[in-house]
Amino acid sequence: MGRIIGIDLGTTNSCVAVLDGDKPRVLENAEGERTTASVIAYTEGETLVGQPAKRQAVTNPQNTLYAIKRLIGRRFEDEEVQRDIEIMPFNIVKADNGDAWVEAQGQKMAAPQVSAEVLKKMKKTAEDFLGEEVTGAVVTVPAYFNDAQRQATKDAGRIAGLDVKRIINEPTAAALAYGLDKQGGDRTIAVYDLGGGTFDISIIEIDEVEGEKTFEVLSTNGDTHLGGEDFDNRMINYLVDEFKKEQGIDLKADPLAMQRVKEAAEKAKIELSSTTQTDVNLPYVTADATGPKHMNIKVTRAKLESLVEDLVQRSLEPLKVALADADLSVGEITDVILVGGQTRMPMVQAKVTEFFGKEPRKDVNPDEAVAMGAAVQGGVLAGEVKDVLLLDVTPLSFGIETMGGVMTKLIEKNTTIPTKADQVFSTAEDNQSAVTIHVLQGERKQATYNKSLGQFNLEGIQPAPRGMPQVEVTFDLDADGILNVSAKDKATGKEQKITIQASGGLSEEEIEAMVQEAEANKEADKKFEELVTARNQADQMIHGTKKQVEEAGEALPADEKAKIEAAIEALESVKSGDDKEAIDAKVQELMQAAQKLMEIAQQKAQAEQAGADAGEQPKQDDDVVDAEFEEVKEDKK
C-alpha cells in the first residue's frame, strides 16, 4: 500500500500532513505556508486556491468562494443556507436534486466539486514533498457531520483524485496527534474544537497496555452552526453599523466594500487575541455624491468580547451533555486540548479553563493538530504505525419508524463504529405483501421530529395474519460513519438494501436542533411514548376481540355481542386521540365487556383439548415489534 496522507479540510483553513519516520509532519504549500486558506477563486481560464485566491477577492467577490464546508452535503432549503445566501457575496443556487450549489463565472457547481480544489492543492503539496504520486488520504470532518456530509466529503476526495481511505472526526484526530508520544499511563482528555464553521467536543480515553495505545471516544457533542465565521460576522455587522452611523451609508449594498470589511474584521479579530485595541482603517471604502468615504474605527478587546459573549457561552452547553453521556465528572478529565483557530481568543480560553477547572494544554497547535492526527491514522491504515487502536463513535442515533409514528432506534448515539445492529419487525395488517422501511436519524421518540434519511420497499412477503411475518432489518454503520440498511423476509429470504444518499442528508442546523430539542423535551417524549403504547394496545385489543367474536359465532349470546360491539365502538372513537387516560379507560371497559368471550374460548379449548393439535398457530416471537409499514399495492400507511 502507498503512502496515506492526512488532510484537515477546514471551513476557513486546511492543512496536510504525512508521517515522516514515526512522527507526523505538517507540510508547507507552494506559498511557504503550513496552512492553506479554504478559498477558491475562478478567473478567466484559471482556478486559484489559498492565498492567491484570497488576495484577489476584493476585485472578484462574486467568483471567490469561501466557507464552502458550510454547504457540503446540504439542501438549498435549509434555513442556515438561506441565511448564508444573505451574507455571501457569491451566488448560492438550488441544484436539480435540491442540494445547495454555488455559481461562479456563470457555471453552477456542487459543493464537493469546489472543495475538491482545496483537496487537489493538499494532494499536490504532499506529492511535491514526497516526490511520488499520492492517491490515499484520511480526511477529517466535524464530529457532528451527518451521513450526507460525510458522503459528500468522500465525493470531494474522489473528484480530487484521492481514494479516501477513512473519514475521521476532527477532535479524535487531534487526540491521536496529542496522545501518540505521551507517556505516563491512562488519560481522559477533553478536546474542545472551535473551528471556522463548527464546534465539537469529544471526551476521549487513552489507555496503554503493554505498549499498545487505545484511543476510545466515550462521547461527542457539538453545535454545527458555531465557528469563527460567526465571530467574524458579528465584527462585520458592528463595523458596518458604526460606519452607517457616522456616514449614513449602508455598505451591505456594495459587494466590493463588504469584501474589504470582511478581511479587515477577520484581521482585527485575530489582532485582538494579542492586543487590547486595534484600528480598522479602510481608506476609500466607498463614495457618494460628496466624495470618497474612509472607515476608521477603533475596536477594543472588551467590545469584541461583548459582541460574541453569547457565542462563547453557547459552546459550554454541549460540554455538559458530553460529560453526562460519558458518565464522567469535570474532575475526572486529566487533560484539556484546544483545537481550531478560534480557540486562540483569550475569552474562549478563559471560559474553557473556568468550566474544567484547569488550564488547557499549551503543547498543541490548534491549526495543525487535526491534520497531524489524520496522518497518524493514515500510518495505522498503511501499516506504518503499530500498537495504535482508534475507536470512534457515531454522534446521532439511527432507527426506523414503527407503529404509531415512533422512532425505534437500532444504533444509539455514541456507539463505537464500525457497528452492525439488527432487529425483527412484523406487519401491521393481515395479508400484507410488502413493507416500507423508513430510515431516520436523530434523538426524538416521535418519528416526525427526526430527519428522514430515506425509505425503500421490501416486496413479496407471503400473506399471513398481522404480526406473523418476520422482517429482519439490519443497520450497518461503517468506520466512516456512513450507513447501509437492508431488510430481509425471514420466510422467503427476499432481501432489499439501500445506501443512504447524500442528497437525503441532514442539515447542520437540524442536527444541532435534534440533540438540543431531545434534551429539552425528554418529558414530552416520555408522554408521547406512553400515548403510542396505549394506542397500540387499543388496536391489538380491538383486532383480537373482533376475531374472537367471529370465532365464537352463535355461542355468543346476542346481548353480549351487542355489549362488546358497543365497547369496541367506544374504544375506536378515542384511540386516535391524545388522551391516554381515556384510551386506557375504554380498553378496560372492552376487557370487562369481553369476559363472556373468554369463558367461551376456554370452554372451546377444553373441548378440543387445546395444545394437542399439531396444526396449532405458531407462537409469535416475543422479540417481534409491531411496525407501521406501507402496503405498497393498497397504499396503506
Swiss-Prot record:
InterPro entries registered for this protein in UniProt: ATPase_NBD, Chaperone_DnaK, Heat_shock_70_CS, HSP70_C_sf, HSP70_peptide-bd_sf, Hsp_70_fam
CDD domains: ASKHA_NBD_HSP70_DnaK-like
Region (Disordered): 601-637
Keyword Cell inner membrane listed: no
Keyword Transcription regulation carried by entry: no
MF (Gene Ontology): ATP binding; ATP-dependent protein folding chaperone; unfolded protein binding
Biased composition (Low complexity): 601-615
Modified residue annotations for Phosphothreonine: T198
Domain of life: Bacteria
Keywords: ATP-binding, Chaperone, Nucleotide-binding, Phosphoprotein, Stress response
SUPFAM superfamilies attached to this UniProt entry: Actin-like ATPase domain (SSF53067), Heat shock protein 70kD (HSP70), C-terminal subdomain (SSF100934), Heat shock protein 70kD (HSP70), peptide-binding domain (SSF100920)
Compositional bias segments (type: Acidic residues): 623-637
Induction: By stress conditions e.g. heat shock.
Function description: Acts as a chaperone.
Family assignment from sequence similarity: Belongs to the heat shock protein 70 family.
PANTHER family listed in its UniProt record: HEAT SHOCK PROTEIN 70KDA
Protein name (record): Chaperone protein DnaK
Species classification: Bacteria, Pseudomonadati, Pseudomonadota, Gammaproteobacteria, Vibrionales
Gene encoding the protein: dnaK
